[in-house]
Amino acid sequence: MHTVCETHAFRAAAQAAGMDDDELEELVELLGANPMAGDVMQGTGGCRKLRFARKGMGKSKGYRTITLYSGERMPVFLLTVFGKGQKVNLSKAERNQLKKVVDQIVDAYAQKAPLVGEVK
C-alpha cells in the first residue's frame, strides 16, 4: 500500500465538487493500491487524470481527479478534482500551472527524503 497525500487545493476542490468522505476514502484506497492509476497528462510534469465514479453513478458522470506519482520514494499527491459537469479537460494554462506545482513538490520532497539506505 502506497502513501497518499491530500493537498489543501485538493480538499477545497473536493468540497466544491461535492465529494464526500466515503468517496475520498475510496479514492485514497484505490490510489494506495495502484498509484499509477489514470492517464498521464501531457505537459504537466507527470500528473495523471483519473476518472472516479460518484456514489450511485458511473465514471462518465463522476469526478476527474488529478494526481501526481513520481516514483516509489514519494507518496501519491492528490492535487485537484472536478466534476465532469464542471470541466472536461484542463486548459494549456492550467496544465502549465500544474507543471510548476509538480516541480515545487518534487524539489521540496527531494530535499527532505533521504535515499534508501542513506544514513543521516
Regions picked out by a protein language model, each given a short descriptive name:
Residues 38-81, 86:
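Basic/aromatic recognition patch in beta-strand/loop cores that engages polyanionic ligands
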